[in-house]
From Swiss-Prot:
Swiss-Prot/TrEMBL catalytic activity: a 5'-end diphospho-ribonucleoside in mRNA + GTP + H(+) = a 5'-end (5'-triphosphoguanosine)-ribonucleoside in mRNA + diphosphate; a 5'-end triphospho-ribonucleoside in mRNA + H2O = a 5'-end diphospho-ribonucleoside in mRNA + phosphate + H(+)
GO cellular component, one term: host cell nucleus
Official protein name in the record: mRNA capping enzyme LEF-4
UniProt organism field: Autographa californica nuclear polyhedrosis virus (AcMNPV)
Keyword flag tRNA-binding: no
Keyword annotations from UniProtKB, A to Z: GTP-binding, Host cytoplasm, Host nucleus, Hydrolase, mRNA capping, mRNA processing, Nucleotide-binding, Nucleotidyltransferase, Transferase
Stretches the record annotates as mRNA triphosphatase: 1-204
EC number: 2.7.7.50, 3.6.1.74
Residues forming the catalytic site: K255 (n6-gmp-lysine intermediate)
UniProt xrefs under InterPro entries: LEF-4
Note: Tpase and GTAse regions, and GTase active site inferred by structural homology with vaccinia virus TPase/GTase family.
Compartment(s) of residence: Host cytoplasm; Host nucleus
């Protein structure tokens, strides 16, 4: 949006992160045959980060312009094109471009980039040739350079994604890049345009499937980076009371009573770690269209079935001409609850189940199903459940349970249970478990006179 002396720019962008030969394959076999070349120009960046654009074609009106770009928003999110198995990590940027007189520019350049812009509807496909890129970061090794770049981004509230990580482009090297951009003026992007953009991305990345790109990734580090969503509150279900407050319910599902776990879907591979430190891994066909890492939450039911209950994050592969392919461990894309639920329901309808053949015995993997309100109570379940999981209209998770539970630590010496505040004395202990172990955590229901022990929580170390 042009305001005269400055322009407010809103855009959704995506970078195609592949090696140079694959980028040229995408250009020659997909972009050039299917889309028209709309613009060509040079972008010159001086040592202060000011950009000067020199057009080559008349489509740009042959006006040389210089701007100072200041970022005001940089949001990573995951978009799900409806009725597909694609989770697309995108970046939403908003910036202010202030027009500059040429006298304010420096003669010392830091970047020289030639850009070819191919147009489809409102989507721009940019194929770039980086002829020159110089940065003080190039003086450091790759690890230190990445840390400095991240720190600078935090200090300036800017965007370091344009910085080539330790690229050191030489005089005989021209670095190719492909980016997709969709600019919009409204408060939010148009879903139709996002669907078009995601279809183009899927088509491009499908051309590289035969390469079977699957770099080594730090699995335990990625699992530790995952943050399951928290329940904002817990609500007791009263027996015989069918009057749920459905006005505040957006989606609901059965609360499965299993062992919680976290896992990663990768190309041809899946790994799961449960809260009691059990690992499940198997080779399997890629369930998602794009070659990224999808982090999920699950419930393991009696070591026979695993239900995917939530999709949490997407980790995207990066590429540079020094360290080649690597996973952006510290740059994940969060999946919002609504997107996760819609994708899980689609996978529930279309994937049904997958057998994890590398486990012993074989385990069936399924996607849980979420429902629209109203909540419905059922007297018969084929799996063990202990209530409902509700996503309310404010996109907060709420736990509905028939019996609110507490995690207590057993004291075998005094034959009592302890909370963080001390022992619970004078209550009768009821349990069907063969034995209660000293200083172990158990999930219990507390009444006025009894402590009913439900199950042993090997995944807990302190009472709750």
């Amino acid at each position: 949006m042009d305001y005269g002396d400055f322009v407010i720019e809103k855009e959704i962008s995506y970078s195609i992160n592949f090696s140079q030969d694959l980028l040229y394959k995408i250009l020659n076999s997909y972009i050039v045959p299917n889309y028209s070349l709309a613009q060509q120009y040079f972008d010159l960046y001086d040592e202060n980060g000011f950009r000067t654009r020199i057009p080559i074609q008349s489509a740009c009106n042959n006006i040389i312009s210089s701007v100072k770009k200041t970022n005001s928003k940089h949001k990573k999110f995951v978009y799900w094109p409806k009725d597909t198995n694609a989770l697309v990590p995108l970046v939403w940027r908003e910036s202010k471009e202030i027009k500059l007189p040429y006298k304010t520019l420096s003669h010392n350049l830091s970047k020289i980039i030639k850009v070819y812009v191919y147009q489809h509807d409102k989507i721009e496909i940019k194929f770039e040739h980086v002829y020159f890129s110089k940065s003080d970061i190039d003086l450091f090794d790759s690890t230190m350079a990445n840390k400095i770049s991240k720190l600078l981004t935090l200090l300036e509230n800017g965007d370091a994604s344009e910085t080539l990580q330790n690229s050191q482009v030489g005089s005989d090297e021209i670095l190719a890049r492909i980016r997709l951009e969709y600019e919009f003026d409204d408060d939010a992007p148009d879903d139709a345009q996002l669907n078009v953009m995601c279809n183009i991305i899927a088509d491009m990345e499908a051309l590289t499937d035969a390469q079977n790109i699957s770099p080594f990734v730090p699995l335990t580090t990625l699992i530790d980076k995952m943050a399951p969503r928290k329940f904002e509150r817990e609500q007791k279900i009263v027996y015989g009371d069918d009057a749920f407050d459905n006005a505040s319910v957006k989606k609901w599902a059965l609360k499965l009573d299993g062992m919680r776990g976290r896992g990663l879907f990768m190309r041809n591979f899946c790994i799961i770690q449960t809260d009691d430190m059990q690992f499940y891994k198997t080779k399997m066909a890629n369930l998602f269209a794009l070659n990224n890492i999808v982090a999920f939450q699950c419930e393991v039911m009696d070591k026979q079935k695993i239900y995917i209950t939530d999709l949490l994050q997407v980790f995207k592969y990066k590429y540079n001409n020094r360290t080649q392919y690597e996973c952006g461990v510290n740059a994940s894309y969060a999946i919002d609850p609504v997107t996760a639920i819609e994708c899980i329901n689609y996978m529930n309808n279309n994937v049904q189940s997958v057998t994890l053949t590398d486990t012993c015995p074989a385990i069936e993997l399924r996607f849980q199903q979420f429902f629209d309100p109203p909540l419905q109570q059922s007297n018969y379940m084929t799996v063990s459940v202990d209530g409902y999981v509700v996503l309310d209209t404010e996109l907060r998770y709420v736990k509905y349970k028939w019996m609110p539970t507490t995690e207590l630590e057993y004291d075998a010496v005094n034959k009592s249970f302890n909370t963080l505040n001390g022992p619970l004395n004078g209550l009768m202990i009821l349990t069907d478990l063969p034995e209660l172990l000293h200083e172990n955590i158990y999930e219990c229901v507390i009444t006025d006179t009894t402590i009913n022990v439900l199950k042993h929580r090997r995944d807990r170390i302190v009472p709750n």
